[in-house]
Amino acid sequence: MLILVPILLLLLFAAIIQFVGGYRHLSIGSTWLITAGSVILVWITLIVFRAILPEGLSINDWNPLGISSDQLVYKLSENTWIFAFLLVSLLVATILTDTVRFGQGNNLTTWTGSMLLTTVGLFSIYSHTLLAVIISWAVIDIVEIGILISVIKNQRIHSVAVVEFGLRFMGTMLVIAALILSKSQNGIEGTTQFSHAVYLLLILGATLRLGVLPLHVPLTANLPIRRSLGTILRFVTPISVLSFLSQVQPQLQYANVILFFNPVALITALYGAVKWTTAGNELTGRPYWMLAFSGLVLASYVQGHIETIVALSIIMVLGGGYIFLRSSTSRFSTILGIVCLLEMVGLPFTPTSPVWSHLPASGTAFANFVYSITLFILFIGFLRHVLRSKKEDTSKEMWMQLFYSVGLILLVLIPWITIIWRFSVIRSQVNWVGPIISIIACGLSYLIVRTRVPRLILESPAYKKAMTPAAVVGKILVEFFTFEWFYLLFRRIYTLLTLPIKFFVKILEGDGGLLWSLLFLALIASVLVGEITF
């Protein structure tokens, strides 16, 4: 039971905070102080857990009817601890940076909702068997829907959200099918080989569960909520899926899986990187940030690079958490953002260095090129959004600005805490080429933007002519990734299915509607009693 302490603490603290803040009407400052202290305590507990790695919890007779022998196993491994630590660290940073967003939204709902989301995210990361993973994913969906309903002022959830949860449900069903086909009683890490069908179902299920499709639109116009609760909301599901993939042994013997998923994932990642870099602001580009890293992770997984997945996850949370939680621009936050970028590029002996470790030893030259270009573009986009000017908020008190800065600093320090237990792996992952090119690319892009060259290029007829087909392709991709085609198809199917009903209703509403009703009633009654004669 010791392994469940962080989860139980988060649940207990969320209930206490909701009670004292909602029913006792405690001041917002005092409520925040209790919240910050609570999540920091859980964060410290998780660090202690990495030092001792307590034994997991195994539930054998979980079904009172005895109709299933599948185990429920919850534990932390060396890899899954990193994902749990990233998630809880993101929660701590969210709470600390929320000091500059006091009174700009329902802070109580934001904080307790973020704690609940983190709790169910930890529950999923802890899951060590397929059945436990399936249950945890279902719980995540239920909690997210409940929080969205409480936050969104409209009476109905946007259709994009409905399709998003529908795709997640389909992903869960695919993993259920994999569980039925595999009939494996071992933990996920204990299974070294899956059949082709089971492996394919697991990859497809994880892809749909990533939660990046369809590309979401904001469900609320409240920017503070989008920065705090929205950030946790968009990271919980992907982190839980990445943790799941880090436990499933890649099956390199299925070459056709690699040949299909690797190019598709890389092209998707490249598209997401370009859209992220050209987005108007970081919140508009957030779905593309998630899409790009999801594609890179999937491509790395099918090639068998688990350490690369861990490094990509650190970059996704480190860079994404920093840029999405940063509410205003200051000299300090800009410098810290550049430090964050240097940490992300994967210099040797840094926590993110495995992001380049598999190059050029594996994969085709074209795949390695697309992978590298995608990372370069992501880093350039990150620098662009860091340097993009925002209105600096000087109206906040000094202590609010202090904790806000501490929250951003924490995000930069998180990877260095993980390296304490990963240095033996990090020191063997040395690649200078990728990081150096990344730094040069970011520097050149900054210098070019500072000149008149971009404006001259954008205004040139040759550029406009070249961008015409690119704009058409981009429009097609946007419609595909936002699932506009699905909405159109669904509407047409719905219209087709409702035609007989509309015809039937039109008949009944006519002048002879009563006679038709009696006739149909007589026919139905005769069928039920079996008295039809011919």
Protein language model regions, located:
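Short helix-boundary/re-entrant hairpin motifs in multi-pass inner-membrane proteins
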Residues: 58, 65, 196, 200-259, ...
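Transmembrane helix-loop-helix hairpins at membrane boundaries of multipass inner-membrane proteins
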Residues: 1-5, 13-105, 111-112, 489, ...
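Alpha-helical multi-pass transmembrane bundles of energy-transducing inner-membrane proteins
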Residues: 20-28, 112-197, 208, 276-337, ...
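Alpha-helical transmembrane segments
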Residues: 132-138, 194-206, 262-266, 299, ...
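Predominantly late transmembrane helices and immediately cytosolic-facing juxtamembrane segments
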Residues: 183, 313-327, 331-336, 361, ...
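Short aromatic-rich membrane-water interface segments that cap or initiate transmembrane helices
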Residues: 64-82, 195-199, 361-371
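Aromatic-capped, Gly/Pro-kinked transmembrane alpha-helices
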Residues: 426-430, 454-534
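C-terminal ends of transmembrane helices
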Residues: 14-25, 91-104, 145-160, 210-224, ...
